[in-house]
Regions:
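A short, conserved alpha-helix in the catalytic core of glycosyltransferases
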Residues: 179-230
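Glycine-rich, basic loop-to-helix element that forms the pyrophosphate-binding segment
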Residues: 81-99, 109-111, 120
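Non-catalytic, C-terminal membrane-associated alpha-helical segments of glycosyltransferases
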Residues: 268-345
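Short, acidic, metal-binding catalytic loop of nucleotide-sugar glycosyltransferases
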Residues: 43-52
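A conserved acidic beta->alpha catalytic loop
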Residues: 44, 59-68, 84
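Short aromatic/hydrophobic "clamp" motif used to bind/position activated sugar donors
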Residues: 104
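Conserved donor NDP-sugar-binding/catalytic core segment of glycosyltransferases
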Residues: 111-155
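A recurrent flexible, glycine/aromatic-enriched loop bordering the glycosyltransferase active site
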Residues: 146-147, 159-161, 167-188, 205, ...
Length: 345
């Protein structure tokens, strides 16, 4: 195991151990130098109406005393300490591998959960067996009147976007199917990771949750949004600013990976003109704000290293799912344009 140290909550009797083993949910929180966020995140979990969960922090070799702080102030939290930074994908994969519960709830360290968050996610997950993931209603931490994310969508332009970002928090009150869950606050059905696969560690960070949701959809599983499971989210809590060289380059590279892995050749050819247009528009945008070279470098790296990715094996029985996904890519492009127009008004 890649964990250097694992702190387990101690149980004093067999009965307590049985109760511990019967939890429905493991909350996995990846952390890298996030000590400043931990009080909000962990104290909000103490106030959950459902106690049917255990909590595991995956610490990616933090240098800010996060581990000692958790041990001192939140002794009920299990900790797995990595020897080096595995990124989001590698870190949460370690966490998922340590879980034995039916459901895994991935939660960013820069979140503060509403009291019914866990309870509502469990209800939604138990409503249908074909649900792979359930996404929370994420609200901007610094502006409680605005949405941060209501599930993620993907377009034929090769752009992923946060559904509802910047819109009034009173919107998006209804459950809905989404392209993928935002893994910053989402519950997954653990047994399906064996079929769908884990997070792609080549991604390191960014678009890894979209790639996972895409793979689940290819196999006919659903990703849904639960408006009653709510969290406040700071955003860019680990990487820093909204745009930086690291984020721009990795996002560009990973967008190439997502398309190469998940689209069979005919679908890639069908979407090639839209993808080319999407990459060009993004390049123009990043040139304008000073990250044009980083974006191009990311695309080049993605193209040159794409064959390191494990391409989804095409199965004839999934043709209907591919067609449904293609329709969603077109529909989501229109949705993106509409939401962009709303934000500009």
């Amino acid at each position: 195991m890649r964990a250097e140290n694992i702190q387990h909550q101690k149980n004093n009797c067999g009965k307590a151990w049985v109760a511990y083993m019967e939890k429905k949910v493991t909350i996995v929180i990846p952390n890298y130098n996030g000590k400043r966020f931990l009080d909000d995140c962990l104290s909000s979990l103490e106030r959950q109406t459902s106690k049917d969960f255990e909590t595991l922090v995956i610490d990616n070799a933090s240098q800010d005393d996060s581990v000692s702080y958790i041990r001192e102030h939140y002794p009920w939290v299990k900790i797995a300490v990595m020897r080096h930074n595995l990124g989001f994908s590698g870190g949460v994969n370690v966490g998922i591998g340590m879980c034995t519960t039916p459901y895994v709830l991935l939660l960013n360290n820069d979140t503060r959960s509403f009291p019914k968050m866990v309870e509502e996610l469990i209800k939604t997950m138990e409503s249908a067996d074909d649900i792979f993931s359930v996404s929370c209603k994420m609200i901007q931490f610094h502006d409680h009147e605005k949405m941060d994310d209501a599930g993620d969508l993907y377009t034929c332009l090769g752009w992923a976007f946060q559904r509802g970002v910047g819109q009034p928090v009173g919107d998006y009150r209804e459950p809905a199917e989404v392209f993928s869950a935002c893994a910053g606050a989402a519950m997954y059905r653990r047994e399906l990771f064996a079929k769908v696969g884990l997070f792609d560690e080549l991604h390191f960070a960014y678009l890894e949750d979209l790639d996972l949701g895409y793979r689940a959809k290819i196999q006919g599983y659903r990703n849904v949004y639960c408006p009653t499971a709510k969290v406040y989210h700071v955003g860019s809590g680990t990487s820093g600013s909204k745009y930086n060289s690291f984020k721009v380059k990795l996002s560009a590279r990973n967008s190439v990976y997502v398309n190469y892995k998940n689209m069979p050749l005919p679908q890639l050819i069908l979407n090639a003109p839209a993808l080319a247009a999407g990459y060009f528009v993004k390049w123009c945008f990043f040139m304008k704000i000073g990250f044009g070279k980083d974006y191009v470098d990311g695309l080049k790296e993605g193209i040159s290293t794409r064959k390191k990715c494990k391409k989804v094996f095409f199965r004839g029985r999934d043709i209907r799912n591919y067609w449904q996904i293609q329709k969603e890519l077109w529909e989501n492009t229109i949705t993106y344009i509409i939401e962009l127009a709303k934000r500009k008004l």
